[in-house]
Amino acid sequence: MLFRSGPWLVTPDELGDPQDVDLWLDVNGQRRQTGNTRTMIFGVAHIVSYLSRFMALQPGDVIPTGTPPGVGMGHKPPLYLKAGDVVTLGGRGLGQQRQRVVDSPVR
């Protein structure tokens, strides 16, 4: 799986409680998603424990867990990303990242 992370990673002592991190996502400067890790269906400890049954996790491994409430498909009308959109996302204590949506050639 390819995904962006960073511009840095934080250690557990820098982050604090992983089950209490405010998350947000803006599209073109407009807030589309907000949430907190405390509302995750499965908690961080449960996810790490479950994955450890099937694989050996190593320091520095990143476990993508999904997205906060407010996905575009759930809006009325739906709000889908399009080429040229700028997506900025972040989390308290984690920093933020910014990406521009580009067209993908049809295959």
Q: Model-predicted segments: where are they?
A:
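Catalytic-pocket segment enriched in acidic/His residues
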Residues: 1-107
